[in-house]
Amino acid sequence: MLSVAARSGPFAPVLSATSRGVAXXXXXXXXXXXXXTPQPPVLDPKRPILSRESLSGQAARRPLVATVGLNVPASVRYSHTDIKVPDFSDYRRSEVLDTTKSSRESSDARKGFSYLVTATTAVGVTYAAKSIVTQFVSSMSASADVLAMSKIEIKLSDIPEGKNMAFKWRGKPLFVRHRTQKEIEQEAAVELSQLRDPQHDLDRVKKPEWMILIGVCTHLGCVPIANAGDFGGYYCPCHGSHYDASGRIRKGPAPLNLEVPTYEFTSDDLVIVG
């Protein structure tokens, strides 16, 4: 028997071989046994090198073309199947969901519904704004006690004929004059062309014998003196304005007649001013 041993070099740790020679007439048989070895370790895969040659295959080979038009369908890229393309179907009305159907048939109905909603909303907003403005304005108005003080009752029997009495009303002097028949006829005969602020005597009174005026001069706010002046009515001592028995400016710097307040005769002997 012949034994041969050979060095396997760097593979010695993992390989082992035996060869034997037998002198006989039969054919020589050689048996080789390989010991079981573990799997070699897996190395990191080779990363591709980013170069012009490696990237040229991924670029487009033909020019890119974009098509724009009213009837051109929108392009959808299906590279990712997990992305849902929005079509806004949930926000569209049922009449216009079908893209192949014309929307002109349902145009009138849709417009009518929109107009109805808009008109209803406008009416509601207007009513709400009216209520808010009304409450705001009413909050600024005078209270009941202030309104009660804004009126004054005057007993006419206390004022003799030909006399003028002064009262305090809303912080201003109030003149109530009981005119004689001569004063009534004299003031009614005055021509409007002679007046700076033309106004007939009958337009300033409700009863000719009673003349009710606010005693504030229309020039600078002084208080005139009754039964004085060149015309027997009122005279302002501040700057010399003369008024007649109807409270009309006749001479001096005052531009307007004396103001006539709002009043009402509740009886023959009682008048309420305010």
UniProtKB/Swiss-Prot annotation:
Cofactor binding note: Binds 1 [2Fe-2S] cluster per subunit. Fe-S cluster delivery to the Rieske protein is mediated by components of the iron sulfur (Fe-S) cluster assembly machinery that reside in the mitochondrial matrix (including HSC20 and LYRM7).
Cofactor(s) the record lists: [2Fe-2S] cluster
Keyword rRNA processing assigned: no
Any one GO molecular function term: 2 iron, 2 sulfur cluster binding
Ranges facing Mitochondrial matrix side: 79-103
Binding-site list for [2Fe-2S] cluster: C217, H219, C236, H239, S241
Cystine connections: C222-C238
Keywords carried by this UniProt record: 2Fe-2S, Disulfide bond, Electron transport, Iron, Iron-sulfur, Membrane, Metal-binding, Mitochondrion, Mitochondrion inner membrane, Respiratory chain, Transit peptide, Translocase, Transmembrane, Transmembrane helix, Transport
Lineage: superkingdom: Eukaryota
Reactions catalysed according to its record: a quinol + 2 Fe(III)-[cytochrome c](out) = a quinone + 2 Fe(II)-[cytochrome c](out) + 2 H(+)(out)
Subcellular location: Mitochondrion inner membrane
Any single Gene Ontology cellular-component annotation: mitochondrial inner membrane
Membrane topology category: Single-pass membrane protein
Record-linked Gene3D superfamilies: Cytochrome Bc1 Complex, Chain I, Rieske [2Fe-2S] iron-sulphur domain, Ubiquinol cytochrome reductase, transmembrane domain
Membrane-spanning ranges: 104-140
Location (main, coarse): mitochondrion
Residue span(s) of domain Rieske: 187-272
Assigned EC number: 7.1.1.8
UniProt PTM comment: Proteolytic processing is necessary for the correct insertion of UQCRFS1 in the complex III dimer. Several fragments are generated during UQCRFS1 insertion, most probably due to the endogenous matrix-processing peptidase (MPP) activity of the 2 core protein subunits UQCRC1/QCR1 and UQCRC2/QCR2, which are homologous to the 2 mitochondrial-processing peptidase (MPP) subunits beta-MPP and alpha-MPP respectively. The action of the protease is also necessary for the clearance of the UQCRFS1 fragments.
Intervals, Mitochondrial intermembrane compartment: 141-274
Family statement drawn from the similarity comment of this UniProt entry: Belongs to the Rieske iron-sulfur protein family.
Note: The Rieske protein is a high potential 2Fe-2S protein.
NCBIfam families reported in the protein's UniProt record: Rieske_proteo (TIGR01416)
Protein name, entry field: Cytochrome b-c1 complex subunit Rieske, mitochondrial
Source organism: Aotus azarae
Gene that this polypeptide is encoded by: UQCRFS1
